[in-house]
């Protein structure tokens, strides 16, 4: 069996019992993850939303014990790659959502760490609605900090600083020094979930990638390590030697390689907070491709958010969109066996990290080794996984993307 599944306590991370999940699908991206069951329905597509498990999957001796195991958000699951150890290597973490109980089985969704933190808000205890006339005047200010330091400090505020808010997350960058500042007003609570604030920070120009990685703290407890890129290197750090995959006609360690192509966008109209003529605006553009010998036609896009409350923030977001789209791009996907030696090792290689792909005799791509960032992994109960890599410049326009 390639995988193991465990039930455990959401708050403490204490492992309870193993679960038998015969068929499932999973996915792992830079900042989020999913796990769902797959079932043969006879007709139509195979697939399911969330998990549907037979009662036999739960080692419970009574209905009361089943109820305790399925308490929504109080219990969680971890999917671990079976590496031969007793517990396996934890890969996917999720809190049990609201179950639907049937005679033969039970269905529920899993809430990833990011989803769970979508219902935690950056508001200090005792500071909401306590101003004159039931107003909220409290303002949270962070200054002289790194972006991941702000994220981790917000994480501590949204977890350990709240009653019943503890989660098994290690916020290891809290208070880290840097050159950034952020201000959050309590009255704007609807836009102050940790998930929303983290998404906003990650999407600014130079914003850090971040990820929650499960690991066994000891033989009984699973915890989540909050990993994030730094101000100087926003990408996630490598956890070992950069792996090399091979792809050539009729073989290789990565199979079914496909290439998606995307044209450039040369202008970004950015808008932020404000209304009508007072709306904050910024135009980011790079018209080099429109003025070359064999020009590209102009493509314009927009980017907007009412949360962008300063001219610099609007500029940063518009510049970020332009930087990601101003050249023609390609994106590679392929399948790998997780059991192949020298390939992708789960628990050592994570989305957001670098992978070398050596490509030969492809019908379109030039021969060479392409160093790309892994964006997502997805698979099922087998040892096969689909890898999706970050977009890179079209190699026929930029020969530096391979060697």
Name what the model sees in each region.
Residues 101-117, 169-264:
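Short beta-strand-centered interaction patches in the first periplasmic/extracellular domains
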Residues 151, 195-198, 267-268, 315:
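Extracytoplasmic/secreted envelope proteins and their assembly/folding machinery
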Residues 1-28:
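Polar/acidic, low-complexity leader/linker segments enriched in S/T/G and N/D
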Residues 2, 46-50, 102-109, 219-223, ...:
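A generic structural signal for beta-strand entry/edge sites
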Residues 5, 73-83, 353-361:
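Short conserved beta-strand and strand-loop elements enriched in small hydrophobics
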Residues 38-69, 247-403:
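An acidic/polar, Gly/Ser/Thr-rich interaction patch typically located in mid-to-C-terminal regions
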Residues 64-173:
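Surface-exposed cap/loop segments at beta↔alpha junctions
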């Amino acid at each position: 069996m390639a995988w193991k599944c465990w039930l455990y306590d959401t708050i403490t991370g204490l492992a309870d019992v193993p679960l038998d999940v015969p068929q499932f699908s999973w996915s792992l991206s830079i900042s989020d993850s999913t796990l769902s069951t797959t079932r043969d329905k006879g007709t139509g597509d195979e697939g399911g939303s969330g998990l549907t498990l037979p009662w036999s999957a739960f080692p419970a001796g009574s209905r009361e014990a089943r109820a305790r195991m399925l308490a929504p958000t109080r219990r969680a699951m971890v999917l671990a790659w079976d590496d031969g150890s007793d517990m396996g290597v934890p890969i996917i973490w999720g809190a049990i959502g609201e179950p639907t109980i049937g005679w033969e089985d039970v269905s529920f969704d899993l809430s990833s760490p990011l989803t769970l933190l979508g219902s935690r808000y950056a508001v200090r205890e005792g500071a909401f609605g306590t101003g004159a006339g039931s107003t909220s005047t409290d303002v949270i200010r962070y200054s002289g900090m790194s972006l991941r330091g702000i994220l981790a400090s917000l994480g501590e505020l949204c977890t350990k600083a709240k009653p019943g808010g503890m989660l098994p997350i290690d916020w290891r960058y809290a208070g880290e020094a840097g050159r950034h500042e952020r201000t959050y007003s309590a009255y704007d609570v609807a836009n102050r979930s940790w998930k929303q604030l983290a998404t906003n920070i990650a999407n600014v120009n130079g914003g850090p990638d971040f990820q929650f990685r499960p690991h066994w703290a000891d033989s009984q407890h699973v915890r989540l390590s909050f990993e994030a890129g730094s101000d100087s290197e926003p990408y996630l750090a490598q956890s070992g030697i950069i792996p090399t995959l091979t792809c050539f006609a009729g073989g290789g360690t990565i199979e079914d390689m496909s290439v998606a192509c995307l044209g450039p966008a040369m202008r970004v109209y950015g808008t932020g907070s404000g209304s009508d003529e007072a709306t904050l605006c910024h135009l980011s553009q790079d018209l080099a491709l429109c003025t070359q010998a064999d020009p590209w036609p102009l493509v314009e896009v927009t980017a907007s958010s009412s949360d962008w409350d300063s001219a610099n923030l609007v500029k940063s977001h518009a510049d970020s969109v332009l930087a990601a789209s101003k050249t023609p791009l390609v994106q590679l996907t392929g399948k790998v066996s997780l059991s192949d030696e020298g390939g992708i090792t789960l628990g050592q290689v994570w989305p957001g990290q670098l992978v070398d792909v050596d490509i030969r005799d492809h019908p379109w791509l030039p021969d060479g080794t392409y160093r790309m960032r892994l964006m997502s992994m997805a698979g099922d109960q087998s040892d096969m996984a689909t890898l999706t890599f970050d977009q890179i410049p079209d190699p026929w326009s930029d020969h530096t993307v391979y060697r």
